[in-house]
């Protein structure tokens, strides 16, 4: 066995995931944020940090971090991010309850299909694992909503440089058509969440709602199929590891 994809949710730290290495696997890719992995990777953002000879327990981060990180990288590279807050409006997941039932998070304990549910997410802070220069600059929260798939990141950030809506969109479009092609998508059509079902990009910028206030405050909306997009990056990561290890 060359690579094990650890998707059970039970082995989300280096110590427990390393049991796969002990059993003969060369690499373990954890399909979630992980505690103490050798490296956390978002494809299209920081895969150059990955060294298959040194890194054996690898985290593919979360679907939300994979959506936020490409946008944050472009904004920080082009304009500089001073600080930012993110909200992910996220389809419900298996961690929630079908009916009101016990859960350590009293809001996630409520029936998932009938309420909008504010809850926590570490996705914004986790961006610093793939973009260390943003350490301490991003935070956020989640609102779980009664849709089965597709989510959207709403990022509001203060920038170092003055800019315009047009300049922000142009920077994101350039990245989507260039270095981040296949990971970041740029679109300006009046679409809704179901239209992105099956989209395999990590992040789909909704350029029609980009806003800049007083030159240095920017708001960017980015959609993501939190199942298909993430699974595709997981596949890409496995391929990248195997190719780089040759």
Task: Kindly give the residue locations of the regions a language model identified.
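Catalytic-loop motifs flanking and including active-site residues across diverse enzymes
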Residues: 63-68, 123, 151, 230
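Structured loop/turn residues at secondary-structure junctions
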Residues: 8-9, 63, 119, 160, ...
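A generic structural signal for alpha-helix starts
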Residues: 11, 66, 163, 228-229
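C-terminal substrate-binding/catalytic lobe of Rossmann-fold NAD(P)-dependent oxidoreductases
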Residues: 80-83, 88-218
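Asparagine-centered polar/low-complexity signal
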Residues: 46-47, 60, 66, 115, ...
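N-terminal Rossmann-like NAD(P) cofactor-binding subdomain of oxidoreductases
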Residues: 1-109, 212, 236, 244-245
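NAD(P)-dependent Rossmann-like dehydrogenase/reductase catalytic/cofactor-binding core
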Residues: 197-246
